[in-house]
């Protein structure tokens, strides 16, 4: 099915990132003006831009309360921490569990508490309220599906790195994905989690939950009964299914349709893990279009190339707090 899509926004954005690395001087700026001036300018740009491209990284979900360590980890993974010495949700995803029953018990929780619940803070919904009447598109390396949960138009979203809510077969010949919601719910119940009055799984008061699921619940591919894995870009076997290619082409088309307009590249919570997908391409596209403005909002990590500092807004702070200030 992917051959039906002629434009690959993912490939094009990676190329733009490479171009940025080759062409930039390497001189970095933290932007111009005090924070109050930057906030005022940001509010004006969101209001007046012809198009807005949101580039979202892990910092956005962290701001929304979907943290991978601390209280959330201790609340839902305390037993794994005690038995296996796992320190946080992220590192637990790489732990060599002793068997599949334990591995998939972990992943059921990992997926559920990041994909199938609403975040503690309304950061995504507040972002949508700022953009709902705008000409926008979202590219994100996040895999937690929180944009759609908040009500963003799914036709304006490109999840480049996969989705916690999808499985794929380990058989690389099967190039499609499978919704895992029903499986996740069964696996959570099998571990002893109970639902609260809002229908959300919680740990029972006695904390008696299990770190294994029944063998018959280990997910298998419905097409060839092979083992399954989560649809995440962790190696060259990541499945770019029809939905992925459709979104990639939509992103490409949005950039093409708006490339000579007053376009706002709004980067939220993008760190150093995947700068080639969002940060560097945003820099390059801002350089190429004199009408473009680049925005970087992040906690403790905000900067832009010196070449575009006059058309950049860099705000160091919690994303949710910044959005509240410009509502």
Regions found by a protein language model. Name each.
Residues 1-327:
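Conserved catalytic alpha/beta core of Sir2/sirtuin-type deacylases, generalized to analogous enzyme cores
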